[in-house]
Each structure stands twice: as C-alpha cells, then as structure tokens.
UniProtKB/Swiss-Prot annotation:
Organism annotation: Baumannia cicadellinicola subsp. Homalodisca coagulata
Broad class of enzyme this protein falls into: transferase
Pathway participation: Amino-acid biosynthesis; L-histidine biosynthesis; L-histidine from 5-phospho-alpha-D-ribose 1-diphosphate: step 7/9
HAMAP family, sorted: HisC_aminotrans_2 (MF_01023)
Subunit structure comment from the entry: Homodimer.
SUPFAM superfamilies on file: PLP-dependent transferases (SSF53383)
Protein name: Histidinol-phosphate aminotransferase
Superkingdom: Bacteria
EC number from the UniProt entry: 2.6.1.9
Keyword Transferase: yes
Entries under InterPro entries matching the protein: Aminotrans_II_pyridoxalP_BS, Aminotransferase_I/II_large, HisP_aminotrans, PyrdxlP-dep_Trfase, PyrdxlP-dep_Trfase_major, PyrdxlP-dep_Trfase_small
Gene that this sequence comes from: hisC
Pfam families linked to this entry: Aminotran_1_2
Amino acid sequence: MSILNLARTNVLTLEPYQSARRIGGGSQGNIWLNANEYPQPTFYMLRSSNLNRYPDCQPQELLNSYAAYAGVQPNQVLACRGADEGIELLIRTFCEPSKDKILFCPPTYGMYRVSAETFGVAYCAIQALDNWQLDLDTIYAQLDCVKLIYICHPNNPTGNIINPSDIRQLLDITHGRTILVVDEAYIDFYPTASISSWINHYPHLVILRTLSKAFALAGLRCGFILANPDIIKLLLKVIAPYPISRPVVDIAKQALSTKGIHQTKRRVANIDINRNWLIQQLAECSCVSVVFPSVTNYLLVRFHPNYHVFQSLWKKGTILRDQNQQIGLANCLRITIGTSLECQNLLTALQALTLVSHKE
C-alpha cells in the first residue's frame, strides 16, 4: 500500500504556499528583494540561561513589553511563532472543517487560503475593488457560514492601507456573527493607521502583528495576536504548550526595549527614504508601466510584458517576487525596499534591460 493512501485527502491535493525563500532557494542571487525582509542584520546579545528548562507558554515580561508597545493590555496579547501561526490558530479555534468558511479579499497574502485548505475549511475570496479597497456590498452578501474574515492592512502585496471607515462598517455588520482579523504585519511602517485601540470597543476584532518586518527579525519567528481576553483564552487552549523559546523571548524583549524601538524607528525612516527615491526613479524607466503607491517596505510595480523583467533579473542575480498569478496583478512584481546600494543596483539592472530591449 502506498503511504499516500494514508494521507488526508485534502493534503494530497493541497497546493502549498510558495514562500519567497522556497521559490528562490535554488537561486544564486546576490540581491534579494523578494521576501520583504529588512536588508541588513540586527545584532542582539543572547542572555538566556537555563536552556535545560522548558519556557513559559506565554512569558509575562514579553507580553508586558509588547502590550506597552501596541497600546493594549497584557491580557489582550498572545505570543506566537510569527503571524502565520496566528492565522492558523484562529482557524483551528473557530472553524469547523467542512462546515465553516473564512473570507479574504485578493489580491492579498496567500497564507489565508493555504491555512484554510490545510485544515479542511472552505474559503470565500471576494476580489478587492479596482483601488484595492474592500467590496463591502459583496462581502455582506457572502457572510453565510463565514467565521473569520482576514483583512491585510496595509495590504500585501499592494502596499495600501484599507479605509478605516470600511473596516469599522465591517465590524459593525459582523458583530455577534463573525470574527474580523486585521493583519497588521506591516503596520510599523505606517503606525498611525493601526486600529489596535479598537479592540476595547469591538469584542470580535483580532489583530495580527509580527517582529519580522520593521523590527528586522524575520529569522526569529515571533508574532503576536491582539484580541479581547475571551478570545485569548480560547486560543490558549489550542496553541502548543511551549511556542516561544527562551532565546526568542530574550531577543524579542531587547527589540521591544526603549533602545530597540528607537532603532526600529530609524530603520523605518531609512526604508521610507529609499522607497521614495526608488518610486521616483522607477517612474522614469521605460520598462515600467505603473508604480503603485505604498506605505510599506515594498513596492508593487507593473512592467511592460515584453521586457520579461522577472526572468531577466533572476538570471543576473536580482530576485524579485512575481505577482503575475494574483487576481488583477498581471505583469506585476513586488520589490522589497533594500539598502540604497541594492536599490541603485536594481535601477541599473532595469536600465540595462531597457537598453538591450531597444537594441533588439
């Protein structure tokens, strides 16, 4: 008997999430602008001892630190292994397989769909409007059996914030019916748009956060769920007994210190400078059709198809993120904002590509 006969049926047909690292793992690239990572390493002193002992399930000092940073109470915070685990925890906690649904609005982050499929939960994909805002009328019409709505804010890969009044309308219409999950993985690049303070007014609001982006700790795998205490208590029934290792807690606490937060704000300021410069320069490239506005550490760019930008740059060692298969994103690439030198090298490569195309 084949071992495949023992696997769950939905796993056999599951299309796994193609992370930037998985896609680009075999490349010899030297400029990695595909994973929305911070382009330079951060340095922390590992102070953990007693590694022979299991860590606390939810280290109180870490919860206190992140609560202070996010402007919520410690009992409204749950620490997890990146925001991706938060996505899965919510589905495992609130959705009955083969009965309930989740809803999301493409083009958006692909893990919402993959996580639902992994656990045998159906999904409803409501395409965003042309300006990548929520199609509220269609969402309202599709709420039957929907337990969770995932809204990415700012949205990945488009880089725009979602209209706060639309989020509030969605919260009002789903009260007592559906949990609204707002994924704020990139909110540290535009903190004034955060709705974390709304948790006190909406018991069905959940917010996802991470240290992977602005805090430059993608390799640490540390994220947070912000929600009312009743939701946190339910999630604690489902989460692994020791989700956050002592070294992760150690480094995360340093990142959330006064000094660490100051360093993060400096990184965000540097990214803003590089992003604004790159927007101006890309707009002058003849291979570029549209540079979409962004408040994050990445840009969505539509290229003229005849330049074959993704493949051409890949061969030269510059790795971008292809978004061509996403709804409404034909000929689009997502470009992580790198160092000033990486941005300059990218621009030089695009200009060279343009020259070659003109000669042909």
